[in-house]
């Protein structure tokens, strides 16, 4: 290990850190002190030298310290990127190289600064910030996001499942769930005000009342889990299957009925469908279809076939006086 100060120029910095297959000690941590900024304008590649410092794998980058690190070149390293503290700013496409796992610790921030980046898996702790900031983050193998996602831009899930539990109310971009991928959320704050383009699977796990205000489109499937009620309106534009596994899905209200565009709606044994409007496709009922909402004469329109699988249809009637 050789100490590198902020006064080193780029040539000396790259020489001392030994990123590019030189035959000396290598070290993958950038420790930037509070109020200091270090801009790395050279490309970082895997270090194949056997002489690596303190167990460094020669291909991973760690950002520590409360200062700011800027990566302003397209990089080629293939290991993990870990932001332990402070801020890491991207200033080039794929500035994180071909990162395997991206870790954000509590108190750390990654600012994508308008640039695209592809990684394998995202892992963020509560108290961290992922600022998409007009950029595009592509996940090939999902991950777990307990921190905050903010800004605009796009977060694309190409494979695996991304489980979001953080408060993302300041994210106004787009979640894209591609075929074979899965996005799981539990509260309105998990989605922020983002659009969702779903071509895979979206799980909405509501344990309490949730008015879904996000625009959701695509031919992917939507799964409703959790005992809470999910109220949807005309912003629900998906055409894939809707699977009500637990809890209730409420279509619109008396003044604004909703025709759900799903080609297939399945009400499971612990599920319920109610509200005003109908479904464009087939309806399979093993649970409850509740037409008792608010007033006698409520109508549920089914555009396809209705199949009862030991499910109940609840009706509200009125006798003449």
What are these regions (language model features)?
Residues 106, 115-116, 126, 197, ...:
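Acidic, glycine-rich low-complexity segments
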Residues 34, 134-137, 222-223, 239, ...:
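Extracellular beta-strand/loop-rich repeat segments of large surface/secreted proteins
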Residues 31, 108-114, 203-205, 274-276, ...:
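Short aromatic-glycine motifs in intrinsically disordered, low-complexity regions
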Residues 62, 125-127, 150, 285, ...:
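Extracellular beta-strand-rich solenoid/capping regions of secreted or surface-exposed proteins
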Residues 10-101, 132-190, 197-265:
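Extracellular repeat-rich scaffold modules on cell surfaces
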């Amino acid at each position: 290990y050789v100490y590198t100060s902020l006064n080193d120029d780029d040539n000396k910095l790259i020489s001392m850190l030994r990123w590019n297959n030189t035959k000396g000690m290598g070290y993958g941590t950038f420790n930037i002190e509070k109020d200091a900024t270090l801009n790395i304008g050279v490309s970082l590649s895997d270090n194949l030298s056997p002489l690596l410092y303190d167990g460094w794998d020669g291909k991973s980058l760690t950002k520590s310290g409360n200062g700011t690190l800027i990566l302003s070149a397209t990089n080629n390293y293939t290991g993990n990127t870990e932001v332990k503290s402070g801020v890491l700013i991207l200033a080039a496409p794929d500035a994180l190289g071909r990162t395997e796992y991206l870790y954000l610790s509590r108190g750390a921030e990654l600012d994508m600064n308008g640039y695209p980046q592809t990684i394998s898996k995202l892992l963020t702790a509560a108290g961290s910030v992922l600022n998409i900031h007009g950029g595009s983050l592509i996940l090939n193998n999902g991950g777990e996001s307990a921190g905050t996602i903010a800004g605009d831009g796009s977060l694309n899930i190409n494979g695996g499942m991304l489980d979001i539990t953080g408060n993302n109310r300041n994210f106004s971009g787009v979640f894209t769930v591609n075929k074979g991928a899965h996005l799981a959320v539990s509260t309105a704050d998990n989605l922020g005000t983002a659009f969702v383009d779903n071509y895979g699977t979206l799980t909405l796990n509501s344990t309490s009342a949730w008015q879904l205000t996000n625009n959701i489109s695509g031919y992917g499937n939507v799964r409703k889990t959790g005992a809470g009620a999910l109220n949807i309106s005309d912003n629900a534009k998906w055409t894939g299957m809707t699977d009500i596994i637990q809890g209730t899905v409420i279509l619109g209200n008396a003044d604004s009925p909703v025709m759900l565009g799903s080609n297939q709606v399945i009400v499971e044994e612990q599920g319920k469908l109610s509200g005003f409007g109908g479904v464009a496709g087939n309806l399979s009922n093993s649970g409850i279809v509740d037409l008792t909402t608010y007033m006698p004469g409520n109508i549920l329109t089914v555009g396809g076939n209705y199949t009862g699988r030991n499910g109940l249809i609840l009706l509200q009637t009125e006798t003449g006086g």
